[in-house]
Amino acid sequence: MAEVTINNSPIHGDSILTAVYGETGPNWSRFHTGTDFAPYGSTPSNPDLYSVCTGVVVNVITYTGTQALGNQVVIQDDSTGNFWRYCHMNAPSPLSIGDRVTTATKVGVLGSTGNVTGPHLHLEYGTTSYWSYDTFLNPSDALGIPNARGTIVHYDGSVVPPEPEPEPEQEIKKHKFPWVLYARKFRNR
């Protein structure tokens, strides 16, 4: 069984991969379209879920009893332009469309809404915010973890990037002789 430690895990604790991208079988119409994370070891059974990227929320789907993937939130990744979809959350995401997220942002709580065999996070990754089989990508590749059922994923919170500092407002320089600043402006051209 493989074990990896990453700083952008959706579960800030230990988890185990219970199904992986590309698997086939009776549970899926064509193939498994995401990576399934379940709590492992001392991690609570319904842990908070966190963004795996810096990005923006583009969709929040509330489970009404008919969606196979239950409560969902979709985030567009700033670094790739691709989309992450978190599925089966126990309640609708606390986020709204347009909210900015980082790897320190809680996106929801692991659950079992929709078609499930037990509580887990089904995490999808794709090139569009609407999903079709030709737009899916392997989430394990994007996270840098093995695409293997039974892989244990450890979260290393010590390497979470800090929240970005707000841009300081540009300070207006003052000089006892204002013409000096005016002259410098032209000298630097």
PLM region spans:
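Acidic, glycine-rich catalytic/binding loops that coordinate metals and/or anionic ligands
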Residues: 1-11, 16, 41-43, 96-102, ...
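A structural signal for short beta-strand/turn segments enriched in small hydrophobics and glycine
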Residues: 49, 55-57, 98-110
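Zn2+-dependent peptidoglycan hydrolase active-site motif and core
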Residues: 22-23, 30-33, 46, 51-94, ...
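Assembly/oligomerization scaffold segments
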Residues: 37-38
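Residue-level signal for pocket-adjacent positions within structured domains
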Residues: 16, 32, 84, 105, ...
